[in-house]
Amino acid sequence: LTPVHDGYEATLTDGSTLIVDTVLCATGRHPNIEGLGLEHTKVTLDSRGYVKADAQFQTEEPSIFALGDMTGGPQLTPVAIAQAMAFAHTHFGNDSKVMDYEFIPTAVFSQPNIGTVGLTEESARDLGLELQIFKSDFKPMKHTLSGRDERTLMKLIVDKSTDRVIGLHMVGPDAGEICQGMAVAM
């Protein structure tokens, strides 16, 4: 990155350049396990420093369970909530539940919102599924009277053999919230 009068000149790995006004530096995440005393237990860590746990959230230490961001899976609020529910059902409700990661809603709360849940068209095709793809570009109903020209883009991926929605991808107002509701239906 080189500062220029209009922002920054970014040199890409292929040698090409582009001028940008904003740079987002995403440095990643690491588990915050310092001070927990795990070194005095049988708990093991993976190569990235995340706690290893099985499908029931059991670590190598019989009295220690691990779930959420410290286990290295998708670091999303809906995942942590679903893991907590599965853990509670299994360990306190006598109803064994295994976490299902298939339809995790994700959102980028930017302007406009970006939301997604389920499979992408590419990943569904890689599974050999015959698909129906539905795309829509529309003005949200809440803007009918306001006169705002904000648009929403939506794409549904449907398994043709079952007529089941297996993916939803959306850009527009409240996309993250809408995808969370769709995840429940899916």
Predicted features along the sequence, with ranges:
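Short beta-strand micro-motifs enriched in acidic
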Residues: 2-4, 46, 157-161
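A short, glycine/Asx- and small/polar-enriched loop/turn
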Residues: 3-8, 61, 147-152
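Short gly/ser/thr-rich secondary-structure transition/capping motifs
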Residues: 4-10, 43-52, 139
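Conserved beta-strand-loop-beta-strand element in the redox core of flavoprotein oxidoreductases
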Residues: 4-18, 23
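Short acidic, glycine-rich loop/turn motifs
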Residues: 12-14, 55, 160
